[in-house]
């Protein structure tokens, strides 16, 4: 198998590390961010900080990419001589992007398109794309790559510390009563995606510092006795970014068998639903 004949298509909600996007020459399908009077393209003409700066005046909506955008990207891939495509998207339980890709893919009879529903979001999904790139770079055959990626879905997890419930409530992710009660008690939820790929609150911790520590401990628990894994730190905004160095040091101490630690700002589309201050701790098990 010639690895040059396999292309990569990922969505912006997967927060694939920029270095991997460049190495794999990946095409990124952008989600949409919609305000009352204008529409932006995720990570193209709007940043996460832009979203945070405007949250007080307006909370935008997010939208999946258009079929036309996906069609154009697949046409480009085809014109570049690729025969196979690995497409990695955030959970179908959180977005219609995965289904949209599958529908559009049916039009391309000459392309062998394998679409991965990661059942995850953010870098939790992006770590699956890292694995896809790695398998292709290693020269694994097509069927083996597909099998391994399907297995990897259960091996990748991210735990989000969310500093306020306000934006999850306004975005319809949690109820108003839960939001008011949580904020009154200074409870910080730890959110992940469950096996069905939908948001699941796995803990509620009083105070931000303890909440971040809990996210780390949950990542440690998920890694278990694994012999090797990738780690990731996702952050939302400047305040969260200032905590990354300390979190990195803690992860190195508690999870020393890591192969690589990826770090990055969450996409603007994800920031819409969480607000600033989010910290995500991701793990992808490489060797159980």
Each model region followed by its residue ranges:
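Mixed-charge interfacial surface used for oligomerization/domain docking
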Residues: 2-7, 13-27, 32, 38, ...
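Class I S-adenosyl-L-methionine
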Residues: 38-100, 104-107
């Amino acid at each position: 198998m010639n690895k040059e004949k396999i292309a990569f298509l990922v969505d912006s909600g997967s927060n694939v590390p920029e270095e991997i996007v460049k190495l794999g020459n990946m095409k990124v399908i952008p989600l949409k961010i919609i305000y009352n009077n204008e529409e932006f393209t995720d990570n193209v003409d709007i940043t996460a900080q832009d979203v945070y700066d405007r949250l007080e005046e307006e909370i935008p909506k997010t939208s999946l990419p258009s079929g036309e955008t996906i069609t154009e990207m697949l046409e480009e891939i085809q014109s570049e001589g690729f025969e196979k495509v690995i497409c990695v998207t955030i959970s179908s339980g959180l977005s219609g992007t995965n289904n949209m890709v599958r529908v559009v893919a049916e039009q391309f009879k000459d392309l062998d398109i394998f679409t991965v529903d990661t059942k995850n979001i953010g870098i939790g999904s992006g770590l699956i794309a890292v694995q896809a790139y790695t398998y292709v770079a290693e020269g694994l055959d097509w069927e083996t790559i597909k099998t391994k990626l399907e297995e990897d879905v259960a091996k990748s997890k991210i735990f989000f510390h969310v500093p306020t419930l306000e934006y999850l409530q306004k975005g319809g992710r949690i109820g108003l009563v839960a939001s008011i009660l949580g904020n009154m008690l200074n409870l910080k939820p730890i959110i992940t995606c469950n096996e069905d790929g939908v948001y699941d609150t796995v803990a509620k911790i009083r105070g931000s510092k303890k909440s971040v520590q809990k996210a780390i401990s949950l990542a440690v628990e998920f890694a278990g006795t694994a012999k090797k894994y990738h780690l990731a730190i996702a952050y939302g905004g400047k305040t969260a970014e200032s905590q990354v160095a300390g979190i990195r040091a803690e992860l190195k101490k508690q999870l020393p068998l890591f192969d690589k630690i990826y770090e990055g700002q969450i996409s603007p589309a994800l920031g819409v639903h969480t607000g600033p201050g989010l910290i995500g701790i991701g793990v992808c098990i490489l060797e159980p």
